[in-house]
A protein has these predicted regions:
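Eukaryotic basic, amphipathic alpha-helical target segments in cytosolic regions
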Residues: 36-40
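Loop/turn positions that initiate beta-strands
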Residues: 70-75
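Short, charged beta-turn/beta-strand-edge "cap" motif at the junction between a beta-strand
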Residues: 81-82
Length: 82
């Protein structure tokens, strides 16, 4: 099964396909921040200090995606500047 996670950075949302989801959650934030920069004319969003669920519950950046996140879930990147 291939997992898809919807990652929000500021006012943008990126669907990230993770394959079997063996990556760490930190990888999701890295991919989302690179996409944000690419699609916003090089605008640097800054560094991620964490991620959270829609409920506000924090996500451990060292979790393995497939162990803790469900397919098609929405998560938000928390930026150091926020």
């Amino acid at each position: 099964m291939s997992l898809k996670v919807n990652v929000h950075v500021r006012d943008q949302m990126y669907s990230i396909f993770c394959g079997p989801g063996s990556q760490k959650v930190r990888w999701l934030s890295d991919v989302a921040l690179h996409r944000y920069e690419h699609f916003n004319n090089g605008s640097d969003p800054g560094l991620a200090k964490g991620m959270r669920f829609e409920t506000g519950v924090l996500i451990d950046m060292e979790w393995t995606i497939s162990d803790k996140l469900e397919n098609d879930v929405h998560v938000w990147v928390i930026l150091k500047e926020d």
